[in-house]
Amino acid sequence: VNEFLANLPYERKPKSLYEPIRYVLSMGGKRIRPTLMLLGYNLFKDNPEKILMNAVALETYHNYTLLHDDLMDNADLRRGHETVHKKWDANTAILSGDSMLVLAYERMAQCDEKHLAKVLKLFTSTALEIGEGQQFDMEFENRNDVKEEEYIEMIRLKTSVLLACALKMGAI
């Protein structure tokens, strides 16, 4: 996954839009989501290379959410590296993040045509849930009465739905 990500071309312009994307995706991380997708796929089929672009789509999407989360939290560091809005600026972080979302969809759409509708439906519903979780997280920062059930639901939406999506997509 790391090698595949590193070799993806970013030939479009402006360079200042795509440089932060390459930067974010080169920071590393555990790559749990693409790994889960590949493992889910490998339970049923023996050629995981076939869905490598889709696995990278999930990683691109995940990193898009981190880029925007860093901006919302005004974080200085991510994985020991300067965040995009600190290294460049907030506008670049927003635009590069938005472009990562589009790239994630473009990469996901490269799946087998017979599974495309199902995959995109799952991906879209998951993306909406993650946004809902992020909004709850932001709202909870201004509340002193957050119930445990609300907090757990926020964590489920922000974190577990994408992990579940990875396994489900692999199985599709």
PLM regions: where:
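Mg2+-dependent prenyl diphosphate-binding active-site environment of isoprenoid biosynthetic enzymes
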Residues: 10-172
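N-terminal amphipathic/basic leader segments beginning at the initiator methionine
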Residues: 1-9
